[in-house]
Design a protein with these regions (language model features):
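Short, flexible loop segments at the rims of nucleotide/cofactor-binding pockets, characterized by
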Residues: 49-51, 83-84, 100-104
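Conserved G1/Walker A P-loop phosphate-binding module
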Residues: 1-80, 180-181, 185-187
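Nucleotide-state-sensitive switch-loop elements of NTP-binding domains
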Residues: 78-89
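Short, glycine/charged-enriched secondary-structure capping and boundary segments
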Residues: 22-23, 41-43, 86-87, 110-114, ...
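Conserved C-terminal guanine-recognition region of P-loop GTPase G domains, centered on the G4
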Residues: 88-155
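Canonical P-loop GTPase G-domain recognition
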Residues: 3-16, 132-187
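Conserved nucleotide-binding/hydrolysis micro-motifs of P-loop NTPases
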Residues: 58, 70, 77-80, 102-104, ...
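Low-complexity, flexible helical/coil segments
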Residues: 40-46, 66, 96-97, 131-136, ...
Length: 187
C-alpha cells in the first residue's frame, strides 16, 4: 500500500451529506486538538494533506481521504458519538481512538472507549504527543492508563509522535492488514 498516494477526497459539514459507503472506512476519533490531522499527515508522509491548527476544534467537518481501496475519515472532535447508529456501522471496520499521552483520559475519552467496547466496534488507542514526555513519564502514564482504561491489557495501543514519526509504521501496518482482510477485527 503506497501511503504517499493518499488523496483528500472531500469535507462534509453534516453526517446527512455523507455519500453511500462503497468501501472500508477507518475513522480517527478523539477530542479537539489531540493530533488527528497531524497523525494523518505523518502516516501519509505529507505536511499539508490535513489542515493542522493550534486552535482546538478547528476541524469542524468530516474529512475523507482515499488510500487505494479504503477511506480514512478524520472526525471532528467527538462528533462520532452524536451520529445515528445506522451511520456508525460505516466506521465499524476500525476506530483509531486518539488520546493525548500527557494526560489521563478525559470524560469524553472514557465515554467513547466505553461506547466502543459495549458496541463491540474494533478500535486501537493511539497515544499522541509521545515525544513530549521523558521515558520515565511515559512509563508512568502507561501504568496510569492501565488503571484508568477498562480492559486496557486487551486493547491494542500505539505510542505515537507526529514530530519524530514514532508509531507511524505500526499504524500503517494496521491499516494495511485491514485493507487486505477487508473488515476483520484485528484487536
Amino acid at each position: 500500500m503506497n501511503f504517499n498516494k493518499a488523496e483528500f477526497v472531500r469535507s462534509y459539514g453534516e453526517y446527512s451529506q455523507l455519500p453511500p459507503s462503497d468501501r472500508l472506512e477507518l475513522a480517527f476519533a478523539g477530542r479537539s486538538n489531540v493530533g488527528k490531522s497531524s497523525l494523518i499527515n505523518k502516516i501519509f508522509n505529507r505536511k499539508n494533506l490535513a489542515r493542522v491548527s493550534a486552535v482546538p476544534g478547528k476541524t469542524a467537518t468530516i474529512n475523507y481521504y482515499s488510500l487505494e481501496n479504503i477511506y480514512l475519515v478524520d472526525l471532528p472532535g467527538y462528533g462520532y458519538a452524536k451520529v445515528a447508529k445506522s451511520d456508525k456501522v460505516r466506521w465499524s471496520g476500525l476506530i483509531f481512538q486518539l488520546i493525548d499521552m500527557r494526560h489521563p483520559p478525559t470524560a469524553d475519552d472514557m465515554q467513547m472507549i466505553n461506547f466502543l467496547i459495549e458496541s463491540e466496534i474494533p478500535f486501537v488507542i493511539i497515544f499522541t504527543k509521545a515525544d513530549k514526555l521523558s521515558k520515565r513519564q511515559r512509563e508512568e502514564r502507561m501504568a496510569g492508563f492501565a488503571q484508568e482504561i477498562p480492559y486496557f491489557s486487551d486493547i491494542e495501543h500505539v505510542e505515537f509522535s507526529a514530530e519524530n514519526g514514532e508509531g507511524a509504521d505500526k499504524i500503517r501496518n494496521i491499516i494495511c492488514e485491514l485493507a487486505e482482510s477487508g473488515n476483520d477485527d484485528i484487536g
